[in-house]
Amino acid sequence: GDEYKVLASYGHIRDLPSKNGSVDPDQDFKMQWEVDSFSKKYLKEITDAAKDSSKIILATDPDREGEAIAWHVKEYLNEKKLLKDKEIERVVFNEITKKAVIHGIQNPRQIEPLLVDAYMARRALDYLVGFNISPILWTKLPGSKSAGRVQSVALKLITEREHQIESFKPE
């Protein structure tokens, strides 16, 4: 209805800078976030709307990444001191139909910390594995791009299998 203003973040609004130390394993994996340059325009729209709102509904995707986006938006607004005396709700729906949206709005919940933790663990691993393995990969295989937590393990499995095939001696 007219009492709602719908704004998009267009995905994640913050990320880990690609410098060393963005994830600190010695400090309980503390992460240093920075606002994504693409997101600055959309964050301004969100913060401007939040200033004039009594209630903020975070309706990102109903998965780990969506939960993280909702958490980042809430944290960002909190850092800007825009949440005082405001009601914050997390709304999820699995389809974009009038019935599903109304049901979601009528059944709000809080941000799910376990989903946010799952995102944090995934992001920390992506950062730590990629940040530490990619430079080694670049020196050994010039022209290669990067190494991630999933592709590195998959590559290891493939090379182990290739070694088994090469060393196979038929009886």
What residue spans do the PLM features occupy?
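C-terminal or mid-to-C-terminal helical accessory/interaction module adjacent to the motor/catalytic core
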Residues: 51, 96-171
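Intrinsically disordered, low-complexity regulatory segments
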Residues: 1-120
